């Protein structure tokens, strides 16, 4: 298959290296699309795989088109060609691409257009010189609609596109063969063996042909439908009257005894072919497949066979048939008036005695309404069945109507409780508009009961469904308007439930944005708290169910609500973090899928919560200036010496020495601080270009020399002050010397003690460092 997201455009070799064309002769569906419709192309391929094989579907991106692909990939051989019309297709529609599309889409019977993000296909047909195609679908249809259209095209037979299936060389050599007898033989040999039309009755008396019914396998979409009768020496065409979408009826033509071919033409194209027989009256009476009295009823064997065939077809093809209002039909007024003699298929079954078909139809949606319909003469199902002598079928209708009229309310209450419990505990809560599908599922599950009880139970279910369908259309439309965006309001799709969707996909892809709605999309909010949406949706659905609940069930529902409230209170006590899901934070989208689990279970959902970031303080206090490490070391040493002195000498330290040690260290620190500030100022001036490097070095040298001179003067003044203070108290000095001599007999110890106290005053400031060596012109921080 063709890779949908190809890396290069217009690269023919890359396309064929991956196997663009499907293998073999399987050429059923050709999908043409642009880049913005790529997801829809993949989505349609998954749908069409229910009808044809995957290898028979070709995805062809138009941004990589080439004229050589027409012959190499044999696009003409595909039975169905589907073009996705999108905004990108109209924007990139060059003359070459227009010519390319005209060659592919020139046929009318097997081309389908899909409107993807477009309101109309008029702009597309204005750019291309091709007739408008009669097959047009939109993204709003359901998958069954797509499959129905594709099946009709694939089942048309080769006659609709024979002109493109014949090779070009053969057509050039034998131009008259394509429209002559040889073409007719090819059509006859290629005509499908499975009949697509059934004409009843199969044998028609020559004297009184009566009326015939034409049952089509698929609905024909066209303006003109004609029936052609062909015998050995006679040909006749007539237009039938429409009974419903797939059934037509007309008066049988007069033909002699023998076989007659019946061709169904739609807009001049043969859609189906079958064969009937004309016979004499005596032979028709003896035949078990023919009506003995055409005006009254069929023979018993023919009725049973027809009943079994129709019932099996309905159960297999349309098991969930739904009766609709007669006013909803879009038939012409003339045909509607003519066909109201038998308004529904149920009335038709009552007339001809089709018991099995009637039992199946009574189980379908809307059977109660259809059973109460009356024909134009005022007769209902009971009168029709009685008039034609079908007493057994009349009893079935009587039981059905009586059970629906006086049915037991307990079953309906049980059903309502099931719906309420489903809406309360289901992880995927459907909208009120989709509860009609829920009723269908409930009814389908009941079909699996035992055969003797099947008809009675399904009649009661139909009665309950009919009573619940009594809501006004306005209320239903208002409920549906609240659920426009299905992808927002259905956060979890229950794929394990009793879903009757025949396809494996969950939802169609999103549509590409329209050019005119870009501004409006920006105005709409794009972010919604999924937890809040789920709670609001469940609350609205619960209110809708409460309106439909009968007074008898309100007491039970109130008790259930009290139990649920008690459970919620327990959950709130056990789960202190449960409120975090409803807040507008970054965990709303993560925890939305687990909101129902939080409600149904008692465990806190905090175990599945990702770790929260460490909270940061709103106000960080400024860091206090700490004492330099070197100063702390000297302070600890001084304190240790002081404690040792108190221990050994038992005399207090001299206060002058403590006071004299203080200015020594801060002076060095202040010197470094002021030196750094001076260096910073000089660096800024050099960067700004106000001063050169040499000038900055010279100025820093002068400043350093000046600072050294000031320090020397200060040290000298401090020394003089100390000498003056010590000289005024000679007796303290003598006592101190005596004490030191007694406790320190060793002269070295006394000498060291004197050196300890005298070192701060005798030490000189360290020599000036080489500024140019370390920083160029900056001072080194560590001495």
UniProtKB/Swiss-Prot annotation:
Subunit structure, briefly?
Interacts with LYN, ITPR1 and ITPR2.
Question: Carries keyword Repeat?
Answer: yes
Q: What is an example of a GO molecular function annotated in this UniProt entry?
A: signaling receptor binding
**Start and end residues of each stretch annotated as Interaction with ITPR2:** 1-154
Keywords of this entry: ANK repeat, B-cell activation, Phosphoprotein, Repeat
Q: Give the organism the record lists.
A: Mus musculus (Mouse)
Q: Which residues form each disulfide bond in the chain?
A: none
Outline the ANK repeats, range by range.
341-370, 377-407
What region holds the TIR domain? 25-153
Which cellular component terms (GO) are annotated to the entry?
perinuclear region of cytoplasm
User: Which PROSITE patterns does this one have?
Assistant: ANK_REP_REGION, DBB, TIR
Keyword set includes Phosphoprotein: yes
- Which residues carry the post-translational modification Phosphotyrosine, per the record? 649
Q: Which InterPro entries does the record cross-reference, listed alphabetically?
A: B-cell_PI3K-Signaling_Adptrs, DBB_domain, PIK3AP1_TIR, TIR_dom, Toll_tir_struct_dom_sf
Output this protein's name. B-cell scaffold protein with ankyrin repeats
Sequence ranges of Pro residues compositional bias: 505-515, 610-620
Lineage, top-rank taxon, reads Eukaryota
Q: Where is the composition biased (Basic and acidic residues)?
A: 444-479, 549-565, 641-660
Spell out the residue ranges making up region: Disordered.
Answer: 422-521, 538-586, 604-624, 641-670
Biased amino acid composition, Acidic residues = 566-586
**One BP term from GO:** B cell activation
Kindly state the tissue distribution recorded for this protein: Specifically expressed in spleen. Highly expressed in immature B-cells and recirculating B-cells, and at low levels in pro-B and pre-B cells.
What does the UniProt PTM comment say about this protein?
Phosphorylated on tyrosines upon BCR activation.
UniProt domain DBB: residue ranges: 199-326
